[in-house]
C-alpha cells in the first residue's frame, strides 16, 4: 500500500511540474481551478434559477408584442415565434404546438414576471462577475443602486436578445430566398451574440476592465453557446423525445433547467478565462496531496478570493500564502 502511494504521489508531482511548464495545459487547468475556488457551479445555479423563471414570461411578452406589431400576418408571427423557440432546442419542439398565446393580460403578467425574475438574474450575474474578478463587497453598488442598474441592464440585454431572435427569425422566414440569406442571418445572429457577451462581461463587473481583455472570453462564449444549441438539438432528437413520452412536463422542465444551467456555465467559464489570462493567474499547483509549494499564481488567486470578503471601508483582509516553501 505504501509503495502504491509513493508511486501515485510521484506521478502527481511529475504531472504538476509538466503542466506548470506547458501553458497549453496549465492555462485551462488554472481556469478550472479558479472556477472551483470561486464556487462557479453554485453561481451558475443561482443565475439559472432566476433565468428559468424569466423565460416563459419573456416568451409571453414576445408573442404578445408580435400580435400587436403584426396583427394581419399570423403566418409570419408563427415563423418568428418558432425561430425564437429554436434558441432553446431542449424545449422548442414542445412549445411550437401553439401553447403560447398573447393577450393584454398575458402582456401585463408576463412583464411583471419577467421584471422580477430578470432583475434577479441580472443581480445574480453581477455577483458572479464581481466574484470572478475579485471585487470586494465594499466596492460594489449599494442595495438601491444595484437594483436600478439591474433594471436598466435588463432592458439593454433584453433588447439585444430580442434583436438576435429577430435575426434568427429572418433566417427562417427568408429561407426561400436561398442558402445565402440563411447563412447571413445566422452569421449576424452569432455576431450579435458575441457582442452581447462582450457587453455583459464589461458592464456586469463593478471594476474598470479593458474591452480588449474581454474579447477572447466573449468569442469563446459565443461559439460555446452555438455548440450548446447544436448539442441540444441532438439531445432532443435522441434522448428527450423518448423521455417526454414517459415523464411529460417534468422532462420539459428538467430539459429547460439543464439547458440554461449549461449555458450559464459556459458563460462563466469564458469569463473566468478572461480573469486568468488578464491577471496571469497560472500556472497553479495541482498536487493531489497539496504537498507541492504554492506558485505565485496560487498566491495571487487566493489573495484575490480572500479580499472579496471586505465589506466595510475600514475593513482590510490580509491573506498569507507561502510560496516555494518560504514565508
Model-derived segments and their meaning:
Residues 1-327:
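Membrane-embedded alpha-helices and immediately adjacent juxtamembrane helical segments
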Amino acid at each position: 500500500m505504501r509503495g502504491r502511494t509513493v508511486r501515485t504521489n510521484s506521478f502527481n508531482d511529475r504531472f504538476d511540474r509538466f503542466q506548470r511548464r506547458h501553458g497549453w495545459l496549465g492555462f485551462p487547468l488554472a481556469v478550472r481551478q479558479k472556477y472551483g475556488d470561486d464556487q462557479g457551479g453554485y453561481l451558475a445555479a443561482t443565475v439559472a434559477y432566476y433565468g428559468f423563471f424569466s423565460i416563459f414570461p419573456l416568451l409571453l411578452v414576445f408573442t404578445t408584442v408580435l400580435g400587436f406589431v403584426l396583427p394581419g400576418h399570423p403566418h409570419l408571427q408563427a415563423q418568428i415565434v418558432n425561430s425564437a423557440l429554436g434558441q432553446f432546442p431542449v424545449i422548442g419542439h414542445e412549445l411550437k404546438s401553439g401553447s403560447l398565446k398573447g393577450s393584454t393580460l398575458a402582456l401585463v403578467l408576463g412583464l411583471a414576471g419577467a421584471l422580477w425574475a430578470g432583475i434577479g438574474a441580472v443581480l445574480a450575474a453581477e455577483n458572479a462577475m464581481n466574484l470572478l474578478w475579485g471585487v470586494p463587497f465594499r466596492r460594489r453598488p449599494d442595495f438601491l443602486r444595484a437594483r436600478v442598474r439591474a433594471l436598466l441592464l435588463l432592458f439593454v440585454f433584453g433588447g439585444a436578445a430580442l434583436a438576435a431572435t429577430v435575426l434568427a427569425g429572418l433566417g427562417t422566414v427568408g429561407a426561400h430566398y436561398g442558402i445565402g440569406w440563411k447563412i447571413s442571418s445566422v452569421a449576424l445572429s452569432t455576431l450579435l451574440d458575441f457582442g452581447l457577451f462582450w457587453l455583459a462581461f464589461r458592464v456586469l463587473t463593478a471594476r474598470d476592465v479593458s474591452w480588449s481583455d474581454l474579447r477572447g472570453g466573449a468569442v469563446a462564449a459565443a461559439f460555446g453557446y452555438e455548440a450548446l444549441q447544436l448539442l441540444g438539438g441532438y439531445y432532443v432528437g435522441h434522448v428527450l423525445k423518448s423521455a417526454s413520452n414517459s415523464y411529460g412536463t417534468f422532462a420539459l422542465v428538467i430539459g429547460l433547467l439543464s439547458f440554461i444551467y449549461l449555458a450559464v456555465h459556459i458563460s462563466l467559464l469564458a469569463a473566468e478565462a478572461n480573469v486568468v489570462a488578464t491577471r496571469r493567474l497560472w500556472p497553479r499547483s495541482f498536487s493531489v496531496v497539496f504537498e507541492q509549494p504554492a506558485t505565485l499564481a496560487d498566491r495571487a488567486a487566493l489573495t484575490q478570493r480572500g479580499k472579496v470578503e471586505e465589506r466595510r471601508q475600514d475593513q482590510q483582509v490580509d491573506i498569507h500564502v507561502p510560496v516555494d516553501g518560504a514565508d
